[in-house]
């Protein structure tokens, strides 16, 4: 699997992901890019789960963003509806984290669209470790969103065997 973490703080939103691709108990690749920019660089998106499935979802989500002129929540809800009802999509095994200047969302294969509390997303095999680390850092430090995301992902990489230390990080200015 993987670990994706997204943090909103001090007018910034950051999304970071590790680079490990595993097949069973074997590491197949260590530098995969699981976080990218969509819709003219205005949306950050990351995935956890099956890589081929995630690329299909990225493509569909980007289509929804275009269709709805970049409106993140509307595009996420429409993708979730398709994911729930389209037989070919319903078999996909992946989750998406998406964020723009206004919102951060998790889109699941069950058709859920969740806006997490405190603007913190952590998902994938190392998600619980990253979430615990990020929450502690957000509560007890004044670190930037970038520093919190990097540190949380690093801690997840120390603990989770399906997460490595190759980090892909994207950052946007967020709404205050």
From Swiss-Prot:
<dbReference type="InterPro" id="IPR029055">
    <property type="entry name" value="Ntn_hydrolases_N"/>
</dbReference>
<dbReference type="GO" id="GO:0051603">
    <property type="term" value="P:proteolysis involved in protein catabolic process"/>
</dbReference>
<feature type="active site">
    <location>
        <position position="2"/>
    </location>
</feature>
<dbReference type="GO" id="GO:0004298">
    <property type="term" value="F:threonine-type endopeptidase activity"/>
</dbReference>
<comment type="similarity">
    <text>Belongs to the peptidase T1B family. HslV subfamily.</text>
</comment>
<dbReference type="InterPro" id="IPR022281">
    <property type="entry name" value="ATP-dep_Prtase_HsIV_su"/>
</dbReference>
<comment type="function">
    <text>Protease subunit of a proteasome-like degradation complex believed to be a general protein degrading machinery.</text>
</comment>
<dbReference type="InterPro" id="IPR001353">
    <property type="entry name" value="Proteasome_sua/b"/>
</dbReference>
<keyword id="KW-0378">Hydrolase</keyword>
<keyword id="KW-0479">Metal-binding</keyword>
<keyword id="KW-0021">Allosteric enzyme</keyword>
<dbReference type="GO" id="GO:0005839">
    <property type="term" value="C:proteasome core complex"/>
</dbReference>
<dbReference type="GO" id="GO:0009376">
    <property type="term" value="C:HslUV protease complex"/>
</dbReference>
<keyword id="KW-0645">Protease</keyword>
<keyword id="KW-0963">Cytoplasm</keyword>
<feature type="binding site">
    <location>
        <position position="163"/>
    </location>
    <ligand>
        <name>Na(+)</name>
    </ligand>
</feature>
<feature type="binding site">
    <location>
        <position position="160"/>
    </location>
    <ligand>
        <name>Na(+)</name>
    </ligand>
</feature>
<comment type="subunit">
    <text>A double ring-shaped homohexamer of HslV is capped on each side by a ring-shaped HslU homohexamer. The assembly of the HslU/HslV complex is dependent on binding of ATP.</text>
</comment>
<keyword id="KW-0888">Threonine protease</keyword>
<dbReference type="GO" id="GO:0046872">
    <property type="term" value="F:metal ion binding"/>
</dbReference>
<protein>
    <recommendedName>
        <fullName>ATP-dependent protease subunit HslV</fullName>
        <ecNumber>3.4.25.2</ecNumber>
    </recommendedName>
</protein>
<dbReference type="Pfam" id="PF00227">
    <property type="entry name" value="Proteasome"/>
</dbReference>
<dbReference type="InterPro" id="IPR023333">
    <property type="entry name" value="Proteasome_suB-type"/>
</dbReference>
<keyword id="KW-0915">Sodium</keyword>
<feature type="binding site">
    <location>
        <position position="157"/>
    </location>
    <ligand>
        <name>Na(+)</name>
    </ligand>
</feature>
């Amino acid at each position: 699997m993987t670990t994706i973490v997204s943090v909103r703080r001090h007018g910034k939103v950051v999304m970071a992901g590790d680079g490990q691709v595993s097949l069973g108990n074997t590491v197949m690749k260590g530098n995969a890019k699981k976080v990218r920019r969509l819709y003219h660089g205005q949306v950050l998106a990351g995935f956890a789960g099956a890589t081929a499935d995630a690329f299909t979802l990225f493509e569909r989500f980007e289509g929804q963003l275009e269709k709805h002129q970049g409106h993140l929540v509307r595009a996420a809800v429409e993708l979730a509806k398709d994911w729930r009802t389209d037989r070919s999509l319903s078999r996909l095994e992946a989750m998406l984290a998406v964020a723009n200047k206004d919102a951060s969302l998790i889109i699941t294969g069950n058709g859920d669209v969740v806006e997490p509390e405190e603007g913190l997303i952590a998902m994938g095999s190392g998600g619980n470790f990253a979430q615990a680390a990020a929450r502690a850092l957000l509560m007890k430090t004044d670190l930037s969103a970038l520093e919190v995301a990097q540190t949380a992902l690093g801690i997840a990489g120390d603990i989770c065997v399906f997460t490595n230390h190759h980090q892909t990080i994207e950052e946007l200015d967020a709404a205050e």
